[in-house]
A protein has these predicted regions:
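Short active-site oxyanion
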Residues: 27, 59-63, 110-112
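A donor-sugar binding/catalytic signature common to diverse glycosyltransferases
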Residues: 53-95
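Short acidic active-site motifs
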Residues: 51-53, 121-124
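Donor-nucleotide binding loops and adjacent catalytic segments primarily
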Residues: 1-59
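Conserved sugar-transfer catalytic core signal across GT-A, GT-B, and GT-C glycosyltransferases
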Residues: 14, 71, 102
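Catalytic binding pocket for nucleotide-activated donors in carbohydrate/polymer assembly enzymes
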Residues: 81-117
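Short acidic-hydrophobic, aromatic-tinged amphipathic segments that line or gate anion-handling sites
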Residues: 44-47, 112-122
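C-terminal amphipathic helix plus adjacent low-complexity
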Residues: 26, 30, 123-141
Length: 141
């Protein structure tokens, strides 16, 4: 599953990179936010109710997300090691680079993979898909 949040800024760099590296037969749920996906051969939904997004993340093999706090925490609560791709201000994807700080901190704690669109590859997705995060409910908290 791919989630780009609901920001007014597009994140075309990530969509285009995923289309380059994903196998043609990959089944992907694209929550594309305001990122235009017309003409790309995919069906994106602009937004999803929070409970549906959480359920989709629990069912997904891998979660690729912008590095928004809500998306990252929802993926972790679903037991997924999210692949976080921060939006960057220099590409007009956000107002500042706080998503880079979020992704860097989560990766330093072993709670996410932080990667740029250019460095994202299939191997990264496979490693994240093979990983799980233990949630509080699983350890009796």
């Amino acid at each position: 599953m791919v989630t780009l949040g609901t920001l007014k800024y597009g994140f075309e760099r990530l969509i285009h990179r995923l289309l380059e590296i994903l196998p043609a037969d990959a089944e992907v749920l694209w929550q594309s936010g305001s990122t235009g996906v017309g003409g790309l051969g995919i069906e994106g939904c602009e937004s999803m109710p929070e409970d549906e997004l959480a359920a989709a993340m629990r069912e997904a093999d891998v979660v690729v997300s912008h590095a928004g706090v809500g998306s990252a925490l929802t993926a972790l609560e679903a037991g997924r090691l999210p692949v976080l791709v921060p939006r960057l201000v220099r590409f007009g994807e956000h107002v500042d680079d706080h998503q880079n700080q979020i992704a860097t901190e989560l990766e330093s704690r072993g709670l996410a993979v932080n990667v740029t669109p250019d460095a994202l590859d299939l191997e990264t997705l496979l490693v994240a898909a093979a990983s799980r995060v233990v949630t509080g409910s699983e350890v009796g908290c």
